[in-house]
Amino acid sequence: GFINTAWTYVDEPGVYRGQCTELCGVYHGYMPIVVKAVSDSEYKDFIQGKRDLKAQQALLTEKLWETDELFAIGEEVYLKNCVACHQVNGAGIPPVFPALAGSEIVMNDKGRQVEILMEGVQGAAMQSYAEQLTEVEIAAVITYTRKAWGNDAGGDGEIVVPKEILDYKNNKL
């Protein structure tokens, strides 16, 4: 999977609608676009809010996390972001969306699983979540998939903590 970005300059704040004109996957050419343009001051407030959130997330990466806490957050993240492709039971929809239940990568290759969520999979439907999810959410959803559907019994049982995701982003993993 992949994400295309484009920039434009808008004179007046408001909501603008359009149509995706680049065919980057099945039905993407039919994707409607909605853009909310805001004033400079609103944009600066938005950016400051993102900076504050990033600082808060950095503090959360230093926290000592419990497995149950990560699992609960991960389940929420999974149900919002992953379930459409990988299904509630982790069975996926092979061959397009692989099963996570019983997956050798999910059960035993934590580093590869982190890489997949951070980078996506070239030539497959799996996109990168590095910009869509926080370090806490990525660590939690990986921990969830490593512990759900019996994966904890057959795998190495390792959890992922937010600090590992931050380190990956900083090329330290």
Locate the predicted segments by residue:
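Flexible coil segments in periplasmic/lumen-exposed cytochrome c-class electron-transfer proteins
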Residues: K50-E69, K80, E131-L173
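Short helix/strand-bridging catalytic loops that position acidic/His residues to coordinate divalent metals
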Residues: I3-W7, F97-S103
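Non-transmembrane, membrane-proximal soluble domains of secreted or membrane proteins
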Residues: G1-A72
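Sequence/structural segment immediately N-terminal to covalent heme-attachment motifs in c-type
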Residues: T67-I93, A101-E119
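Extracytoplasmic electron-transfer domains, predominantly the class I c-type cytochrome c fold
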Residues: A99-G155
